[in-house]
Design a protein with these regions (language model features):
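N-terminal export signals
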Residues: 5-30
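C-terminal segment of N-terminal export signals and the immediately downstream linker at the start
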Residues: 22-65, 69-71
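N-terminal small/polar loop signature for handling phosphorylated ligands or for N-terminal nucleophile
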Residues: 92-148
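Short, acidic/small-residue loops that bind anionic groups at enzyme active sites
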Residues: 142-164, 172-178, 312
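Conserved anion/nucleotide-ligand pocket segment
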Residues: 174-234
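Internal helical hairpin/lid segments
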Residues: 244-301
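ATP/nucleoside-binding phosphotransfer catalytic cores, i.e., glycine-rich phosphate-binding loops
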Residues: 288, 292-355
Length: 355
């Protein structure tokens, strides 16, 4: 699809139909509370790799985008996808109205599930975070996702989505790009090698290692291996005590947040510690804690992170390029990784997509 055709068809031809794909409201709670096996016992399912000509669905499971961001950021992202041979397909309910939600829960869940079930859609990249994913988790048909495994990417509020899909479906997902966020050269550099081997002329996966000794900080030295889990700290703690609670046992956990004061970060980390979540990890990678509001107290976010995490005696590094920042590293949820805090290295050891 050329750019002109795409821009002219954003509101109509690029939108999927509205056929019902949801479980009934009465069954939603039963789906939420259903027993599930410990998927961590089995190798994860890999979604198909991106390929030239593949259609990429762009839904809004949480908040919508402002009209000006749609015109500038989302269309810019769509153009970038076209530039690497992909075809963007935007859901109908993505532009924000008067609510903090892009659309009613049933509509957001339905549009997401339409992308899952549509065989013409090869991947799903969420449009933005904000709030709302938790509200639709009981409406997600996880069995349909298992039957139609696809690349699913998002961060921030979508921490709840990508981690839950991995847990319920044993499917690798991606804490990665969104359509209304920057898709700069750095972000593409650490996303495309994981998901688009054809574009990178890769015939097989090779270990992907990030190391920037000048920027990365070491809170606790050491080396650890584990499967990658994590995302936004606020969302992870919000899921605790629900059926979508994240199991951190043996994981390399990564955390980031935006706009939180040091004492609030302390409270969330303490909650995780009291629940045994931090002690269960093999290692921890700290992303960016941006727009931190430390005007009332002298204690900084960095001091808080050190005081809460150093006593764990597991490898912990900080200042990693992920979170609510322009340049973002993509974390494949469920893939085996190694954290080498001694040498300030983080390595993805397994393929994240099916070649």
């Amino acid at each position: 699809m050329n750019r002109r055709t795409f821009v002219q068809s954003l509101g109509t031809a690029g939108v999927l139909g509205s056929a019902s794909v949801l479980a009934s409201p009465a069954s939603a709670l039963a789906n939420t509370l259903s027993n599930k096996p410990n998927k961590r016992l089995f190798p994860p399912t890999l979604p198909p790799a991106l390929k030239a000509g593949m259609k990429v669905g762009i839904p809004a499971p949480a908040s919508g985008v402002a009209k000006e961001d749609f015109e500038k950021k989302v269309k810019g992202f769509a153009t970038a996808l076209e530039g690497i041979g992909l075809v963007p397909v935007i859901a109908k309910s993505v532009v924000a109205g008067t609510s903090y939600l892009a659309a009613p829960d049933e509509v957001r869940a339905q549009e997401f599930m339409e992308f899952v079930k549509n065989p013409d859609i090869g991947a799903i990249i969420c449009i933005r975070g904000g709030y709302g994913v938790m509200r639709i988790l009981p409406m997600i048909d996880f069995s349909a996702i298992q039957q139609n495994p696809k690349l699913i990417s998002g961060f921030s509020d979508h921490t709840a989505l990508v981690n839950t899909i991995y847990d319920r479906c044993n499917l690798v997902t991606f804490h990665g790009p969104m359509a209304a966020a920057e898709f700069d050269d750095f972000t593409q550099q650490w996303f495309l090698p994981l998901v688009y081997p054809e574009h990178r002329k890769q015939s097989r996966f090779e270990t992907l290692t990030y190391s920037d000794p000048a920027k990365l900080t070491v809170i606790t030295p050491g080396k650890a291996r584990g499967r990658i889990l994590g995302g936004n700290l606020t969302m992870i703690t919000a899921l605790m005590g629900t059926p979508y609670d994240i199991n951190t046992t043996g994981a390399i956990l990564f955390l980031e947040d935006v706009g939180e004061q040091a004492y609030k970060i302390d409270r969330m980390l303490t909650q995780m510690w009291l629940a045994g979540k931090l002690q269960a990890c093999a290692g921890i990678v700290l992303g960016q804690f941006t727009e931190a509001k430390d005007t009332q107290y002298a204690t900084t976010v960095e001091e808080t992170l050190r005081s809460r995490l150093a006593p764990l005696n597991i490898p912990v590094v900080g200042n990693f390029p992920l979170g609510h920042v322009k340049e973002k590293f993509t974390m494949p949820i469920g893939v085996l990784a190694e954290l080498d805090a001694d040498n300030k290295k983080f390595s993805i050891l397994e393929a994240a997509v099916r070649y």
